[in-house]
């Protein structure tokens, strides 16, 4: 492992470099340092390549080639873990070589990489740490030492504070699944978050990046460590007004929130402009896409699927409710306010950040480097939503097919039906036409 640190660089400047030794030098590459102002910028987000064989290498390479073509002005790649497959063993160096030299080479020759530790990247030989050169200050001050150096670090780009961290070491020190406690997360990691926010108080956006999910809608939804993560870190996110959490791990596309991290419910009036489309059991079971999400009073949680081959599939509402005893989140289905489903192909996100909004465009890729838009949404942070609720009651006569009710109200933000037990059922709508076809008798 060879690492170098460049110092004394000037902002917004192009530098060229090569790597090697006398008689054996690489080609000359170049990079541009960040500007010091808060101008708009783009970055790329990918996750879960799980490099294990040539098919997985190629799927991830499609994502990289397509992303380089789609967003040539992106400043860096944020990768939220599971670079390779051979976790919990002595990591195969072949997998790492393929990730750097084949799959991601189209991107890494032109931009920086912000890596996030995933569970498949953890190995007894500490191989993850040999491939990255991130800040190690957290490890030097933590009372409970994580396994790897440099897995918890932050940086500022434009008007955004990025806080990259890991859940992987939650079991070091004292912890309890039953009580939802972890001294590592609630002390060291939580205080680190507080320190970063205190150090950079004037950035508009606070973005966290982590591999394992705090909220998700697929195979890891009922994991007991996920419940522990929520118990220890959601209060911290609420305290610090974390705006956007970019995750990995569950290999599906999901836009969740903005969530009040105390109540684990959607912040009233925070979701607008979601488009209703025909549902698809795998790609879009809720029939929603797009949207504008106001994170002034909550946090938006996001996963864009996988840049590779391994895919999971979305749970139904019944499956989510059946897992309540484990995940302990009431109304989990209602947290999926944007598009939710399986893209069915390698995916990447092009994320534009300005002082007024964050725009997220997610594309799928193929062997021909063809980008196909899968979803796009915006994040804003407005103090006053300007939303006034007009609560009305109406008799509903569902037929389970295509019933709708109409209203003369305009500028509708959301519609809920409430049964006699007080349970809330969010209803899709298109302008002044409210879809009630999925409601059962008696509501």
Q: What do these predicted ranges mean?
A:
Residues 1, 25, 126-208, 213-222, ...:
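Metal-dependent phosphoesterase/phosphodiesterase active-site architecture
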Residues 1-117, 122-149, 187, 191-195, ...:
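Divalent metal-dependent phosphoesterase catalytic cores across multiple superfamilies
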Residues 2-4, 349, 432-434:
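Short strand-edge motifs at loop-to-beta-strand transitions and within beta-strands
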Residues 17, 360, 414-415:
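Generic short beta-strand
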Residues 75, 111, 203-205, 413:
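Short coil/turn segments at beta-strand junctions that form active-site/ligand-binding loops
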Residues 388-443:
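C-terminal outer-membrane/trafficking sorting elements
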